[in-house]
């Protein structure tokens, strides 16, 4: 039995779960998420808990068991509390500005970059050097954060660029510069 897969998923009050074959839809205060799960894995609701079961101990079923349980648990957590990633922008003149369509980023290029936020993801900037990405889907929040970070990754000499909050950028010494 998978250590992760066998744990039941608690369903908080105010969250409804609809299971239709291999499709699971979770509705809550932060929105609605749907996902088609692997056909072999069975998700069932018993009271205020969801249980994930696998048909056999085949290697493939073992691998999908824990994955499916975590995907469903992330859906439940997403519609109740949501997910959040914080990006920090470092560098002279590097900044973020929030527009109705998403974010306008100045990252040291000759032009500003317009980043359009996908549906279900909100981008805010409490100050010009911090970008907060929030949403119900952990996958989408992480993907948006990774895409914005990839526009200008932190470089190792001065540390300029976009990094995750708490990320440690390994620094390098510059050239010796002697005669």
From Swiss-Prot:
An annotated GO BP: cytoplasmic translation
Family: Belongs to the universal ribosomal protein uL6 family.
Cellular component GO terms held in the UniProt record: cytosolic large ribosomal subunit
PANTHER family named among the record's database cross-references: 60S/50S RIBOSOMAL PROTEIN L6/L9, LARGE RIBOSOMAL SUBUNIT PROTEIN UL6M
Ribonucleoprotein among keywords: yes
Organism expressing this protein natively: Gemmatimonas aurantiaca (strain DSM 14586 / JCM 11422 / NBRC 100505 / T-27)
Name the UniProt record assigns to this protein: Large ribosomal subunit protein uL6
HAMAP family linked: Ribosomal_uL6_B
Top-level taxon: Bacteria
GO molecular function terms attached to this record: rRNA binding; structural constituent of ribosome
Pfam assignment, any one: Ribosomal_L6
Oligomer status and interactors: Part of the 50S ribosomal subunit.
Keywords tagged on the record: Ribonucleoprotein, Ribosomal protein, RNA-binding, rRNA-binding
Role played: This protein binds to the 23S rRNA, and is important in its secondary structure. It is located near the subunit interface in the base of the L7/L12 stalk, and near the tRNA binding site of the peptidyltransferase center.
């Amino acid at each position: 039995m998978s250590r992760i897969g066998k744990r039941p998923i608690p369903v908080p009050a105010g969250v409804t779960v609809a299971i239709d074959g291999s499709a699971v839809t979770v509705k809550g205060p932060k929105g609605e998420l749907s996902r088609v799960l692997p056909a072999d894995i069975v998700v069932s609701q018993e009271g205020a808990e969801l249980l994930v079961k696998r048909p056999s101990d085949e290697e493939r079923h073992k691998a999908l068991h824990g994955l499916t349980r975590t995907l469903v648990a992330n859906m439940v957590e997403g519609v109740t509390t949501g997910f959040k990633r914080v990006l920090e922008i470092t560098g002279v003149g590097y900044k973020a500005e929030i527009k109705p369509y998403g974010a306008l980023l100045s990252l040291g290029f000759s032009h500003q970059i317009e980043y359009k936020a996908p549906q279900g993801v909100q981008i805010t900037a409490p100050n010009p050097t911090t970008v907060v990405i929030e949403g119900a889907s952990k996958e989408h929040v992480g993907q948006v954060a990774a895409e914005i970070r990839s526009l200008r990754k932190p470089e190792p000499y001065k540390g300029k660029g976009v990094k995750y909050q708490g990320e440690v950028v390994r620094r390098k010494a510059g050239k010796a510069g002697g005669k």
